[in-house]
């Protein structure tokens, strides 16, 4: 699956994202700088990595969501192309309107960096088919603003539509309904705060993140 990893000023998980993509999806995966106005021809997956884009000025992801490349990312998503936003990438997706809700300060008001357990809430998406229903997986988090919030109507819509893909088994940040990752209505855009790209090799402590990439690899073109 041809993959483009978007780089914003302040991205710091872009190399991890590229490594995971090259290891599991596309050995020719490449970086795309935020000032570009088009994605590489044939791009199938856009990966928005974690970090502190633009120093988190205004709000996390707010400026990055208005970068030139995001017009192409939106068009890609609207055409049915896959988009994966991790951590700051999830924040960018909400700021860009590609996913509902917002990510606010952690309930403890400090940065958290540790492995957490997630429950696979919906394994029928193109991002989660490699997992079993209800499977508990270990994926690291690293964020200060990962507390997912949306109004009651939006939360109900997410829950009723099976759009909560990953849920915290032991909520670390105060996210409503223990939400760790959601998809859009069409199912081609996933945002999640935990970092699957940091859990693709046993050397890193867990291989449980591989399922996200292995799921995408099974998508029929």
Curated annotation (Swiss-Prot):
It catalyses: N(2)-formyl-N(1)-(5-phospho-beta-D-ribosyl)glycinamide + L-glutamine + ATP + H2O = 2-formamido-N(1)-(5-O-phospho-beta-D-ribosyl)acetamidine + L-glutamate + ADP + phosphate + H(+); L-glutamine + H2O = L-glutamate + NH4(+). Keywords: ATP-binding, Cytoplasm, Glutamine amidotransferase, Hydrolase, Ligase, Nucleotide-binding, Purine biosynthesis. Its EC number is 6.3.5.3, 3.5.1.2. It is found in: Cytoplasm. One of its GO terms (molecular function) is phosphoribosylformylglycinamidine synthase activity. One of its GO terms (biological process) is 'de novo' IMP biosynthetic process. SUPFAM superfamilies: Class I glutamine amidotransferase-like. Its main location: cytoplasm. The active site is at 87 (nucleophile), 195, 197. Pfam families: GATase_5. Pathway: Purine metabolism; IMP biosynthesis via de novo pathway; 5-amino-1-(5-phospho-D-ribosyl)imidazole from N(2)-formyl-N(1)-(5-phospho-D-ribosyl)glycinamide: step 1/2. Residues 2-221 form the Glutamine amidotransferase type-1 domain. SMART domains: GATase_5. One of its GO terms (cellular component) is cytoplasm. Gene3D superfamilies: 3.40.50.880. Part of the FGAM synthase complex composed of 1 PurL, 1 PurQ and 2 PurS subunits. Part of the phosphoribosylformylglycinamidine synthase complex involved in the purines biosynthetic pathway. Catalyzes the ATP-dependent conversion of formylglycinamide ribonucleotide (FGAR) and glutamine to yield formylglycinamidine ribonucleotide (FGAM) and glutamate. The FGAM synthase complex is composed of three subunits. PurQ produces an ammonia molecule by converting glutamine to glutamate. PurL transfers the ammonia molecule to FGAR to form FGAM in an ATP-dependent manner. HAMAP family: PurQ (MF_00421). This is Phosphoribosylformylglycinamidine synthase subunit PurQ. It comes from Deinococcus radiodurans (strain ATCC 13939 / DSM 20539 / JCM 16871 / CCUG 27074 / LMG 4051 / NBRC 15346 / NCIMB 9279 / VKM B-1422 / R1).
């Amino acid at each position: 699956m041809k993959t483009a990893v978007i780089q914003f000023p302040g991205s710091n998980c872009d190399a991890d994202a590229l490594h995971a993509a090259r290891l599991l999806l596309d050995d020719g995966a490449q970086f795309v700088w935020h000032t570009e106005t088009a994605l590489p021809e044939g791009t199938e997956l856009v990966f928005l990595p974690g970090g502190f884009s633009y120093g988190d000025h205004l709000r996390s992801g707010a400026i990055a969501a208005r970068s030139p490349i995001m017009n192409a990312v939106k068009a890609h998503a609207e055409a049915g192309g896959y988009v994966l936003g991790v951590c700051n990438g999830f924040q960018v997706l909400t700021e860009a309107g590609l996913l509902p809700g917002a990510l606010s300060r952690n309930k403890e008001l400090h940065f958290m960096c540790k492995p957490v357990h997630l429950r696979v809430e919906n394994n029928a998406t193109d991002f989660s088919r490699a997992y079993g229903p209800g499977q508990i997986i270990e994926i690291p988090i690293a964020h200060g603003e990962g507390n997912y919030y949306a109004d009651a109507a939006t939360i109900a819509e997410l829950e009723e539509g099976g759009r909560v893909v990953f849920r915290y088994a032991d909520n670390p940040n105060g996210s409503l309904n223990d939400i760790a990752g959601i998809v859009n209505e069409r199912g081609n855009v996933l945002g999640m705060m935990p970092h699957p790209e940091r859990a693709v090799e046993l050397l890193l402590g867990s291989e449980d993140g591989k399922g996200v990439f292995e799921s995408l690899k099974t998508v029929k073109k």
